Amino acid sequence: IVFNVFVQPADGSGDARAVTNSPNPLFPTTWHPTDDVVAVTENHPATNYNVVLAKPSGRSPDTVTPLPPLLGTSAQELTAAFAPDGKWIAYVSNEGGRSGVYVRPYPGPGVPRLVAPAGFDPTWSPARNELFFMGLDQHLMVVTYRTVGSAFQSDAPRPWSTARAVPRPRGAVGYDGRGFDIHPDGNRVIG
């Protein structure tokens, strides 16, 4: 079995074409806002879940080639999201022993910064300096952040609402299964 990520014009013109060619399950999660790069979660048998990068403008691959990992660590990394300015990427990792939300500069270099010690599905507000994520208790959480030069600083995570989200199916990881999204004005959430 070969797993691929496909790209096609949004208006439906033209054929879909593969931009990856992998023997491992792939789950695309985010486009970079200005570069021609897509972050993809790859479920690799040797390294588990990793965020890898694909370039959709390249020609369709005809051989199975490894995709470059974003971090290349032994920890699981998944469900990446590029910041609206494209200078940061948030993702989930179990580097600290449980699923937490990390942010690092894109394309790097830079040290990953833990912004939430427990959570998943990071999603940037398109209108405010806020990073949303789902807490392990199914509450939508948010951190306010600021960037100073090449430093990313964030406040402590806080609940965005007291309402709880519908739980994900047990074991449902490694796909962009966000149960919420942020309105372009940054004032509303759908979920």
Place the predicted regions along the sequence by residue:
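Hydrophobic alpha-helical membrane-insertion signals
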Residues: 134-137, 142-152, 156-157, 182-191
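A structure-centric signal for secondary-structure junctions around beta-strands
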Residues: 2, 35, 48-50, 64-67, ...
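A flexible loop/linker signature enriched in serine peptidases of the S9 family
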Residues: 1-6, 20-25, 41-53, 72-78, ...
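Multi-bladed beta-propeller domains
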Residues: 8-25, 54-78, 103-120, 126, ...
